From Swiss-Prot:
Residues 77-96 bind DNA. NCBIfam families: PRK00430.1 (NF001659). This is DNA-binding protein Fis. It comes from the Bacteria. It comes from Shewanella frigidimarina (strain NCIMB 400). InterPro entries: Fis_DNA-bd (IPR005412), Homeodomain-like_sf (IPR009057), HTH_Fis (IPR002197), Trans_regulatory_Fis (IPR050207). Gene3D superfamilies: Homeodomain-like. Belongs to the transcriptional regulatory Fis family. GO terms for molecular function: DNA-binding transcription factor activity; sequence-specific DNA binding. Pfam families: HTH_8. Activates ribosomal RNA transcription. Plays a direct role in upstream activation of rRNA promoters.
């Protein structure tokens, strides 16, 4: 089951902005892309019921996010955890979940 750890980035997306050293970035493009993808998913169900959609969406977003962050930090887990707003142990657990350790 999904580890319901508080995630600073999720909170920042919820309030509609991400603070950086150079200013504020509004993640509207990301939000719009997720909305289109989820809408597309439901349109392809052809009347069938979906289950565990929340878990599926989180996994589909979380895995590439972790991959990109780890590339950006050149594998530095401490830096990656700080960027994500989670502790390093939680990051390790998530990396293991997706086979990225």
């Amino acid at each position: 089951m999904f580890d319901q750890t508080t995630n600073t980035e999720v909170h920042q997306l919820t309030v509609g902005k991400i603070e950086t050293a150079n200013g504020t970035i509004k993640p509207q493009l990301l939000r719009d892309a997720v909305k289109r993808a989820v809408t597309n998913f439901f349109s392809q169900l052809d009347g069938q019921e979906a289950s565990e959609v929340y878990e599926m969406v989180l996994c589909e977003v979380e895995a590439p996010l972790l991959d990109i962050i780890m590339q950006h930090t050149r594998g530095n887990q401490t830096r990656a955890a700080n960027m994500l707003g989670i502790n390093r142990g939680t990051l390790r657990k998530k990396l293991k979940k997706y086979g990225m350790n």
